[in-house]
Structure formats: structure tokens, C-alpha cells
Amino acid sequence: MTKEDIKKVLIKNKSLLKRYKVNKIGIFGSCVTGKMKKKSDVDLLVDFDEMIDLFDYVHLSDELQQMLKTKVDLSTPDAIKPYIKPKILREVEWIEGL
């Protein structure tokens, strides 16, 4: 699955993202750097309109994995380790059209 394929799937399922109060979602990691392999996971950075509980966070992650048919590593800006945060925030490609 290419970066563009991932973007299309996310845009197509924007109602699901809104249900989980997703303000914006972006792709980072190997999908963006062009180093994605067949067994690579999809790294997604999500910013919520308001805080959601752990149950909903895990459920969202599961639904994203089902949608994308691959393992998803879901993260929030606040959860990123300080030493790697600047790199990820420079690299992330936020999905337009949500």
C-alpha cells in the first residue's frame, strides 16, 4: 500500500475519524520517507478535538488496522518522546480533506 493509497482510505473513512473526535491525522515514518517494505507498519499521528478514553483509542487503532489491512502504529503529539518529536513533526504529512 502506498502513501497515496493510505490517504485515500483515510479520506474515504472520514466519518469514522470524526466519530472518534479526530481533529487531524497524518502519516510519518517509512511511508513518508519512501523506505516502506511489504511488512512495514503504518505510522499515524493523530490529534483529537478533545481527549478520548483509552478504550476508544484502542478501538480506533483496531479500526484503522482493519481499514488499511496492515499493522498501524498510532500516536499523538503529546505521546512522542522528546528526543524524536522534532523529527516526526517535521516529517508528518497531515491528510487534507478531513
Question: What is the predicted role of each segment?
Answer:
Residues 41-43:
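Acidic Asp/Glu-based divalent-cation binding sites
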Residues 27:
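Conserved histidines in hydrophobic membrane contexts and catalytic metal-binding motifs
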Residues 1-24, 32-38, 50-98:
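Catalytic core of pol beta-like nucleotidyltransferases
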Residues 45-47:
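Short hydrophobic/aromatic beta-strand micro-patches
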